[in-house]
Amino acid sequence: MSAKQNFEEVWFAGVHGDIGGGYPEAQSGAVKIPLAWMIKETKPAGLLYRSRTVNDIVLGKSGKKYVPLDATVPLHDSMSVGWKILEYIPRRVPENSWRKHGSRSAIYFPLSDRRFIPDDALIHISVKERKDASSYDPPNLPANPHFVP
């Protein structure tokens, strides 16, 4: 018999590389937040982690070459010049787009649209920390966000 499976979708601040990694270590304070969250969430399922490795690489506690997680570090802009040009090419409105809500047009210009975040979405508490510490105020954040640790 297979084990029960479940998942939880939690939203974090940043572009793809700010969430999944790929930037140099010195610019990786934001990516450590979802990584720490995934480690915390998967431990109860039996995944094992070396505490020293997590403390060094994720939490930056060793004082070595790894930066600690930080909700207030600058986020990246993944819209390169080439990508921005592509944003002016008309395309179909995706089914999960906020544009589907009340839109009658099947075609639109992306123009760097932000993702639609549902009202009942779980938003990581680090987004609130970023908002409280700076002028960060994403227009697609629900009016009454549900923040989770």
What are these regions (language model features)?
Residues 1-149:
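Active-site- or binding-pocket-proximal scaffold segments within functional domains
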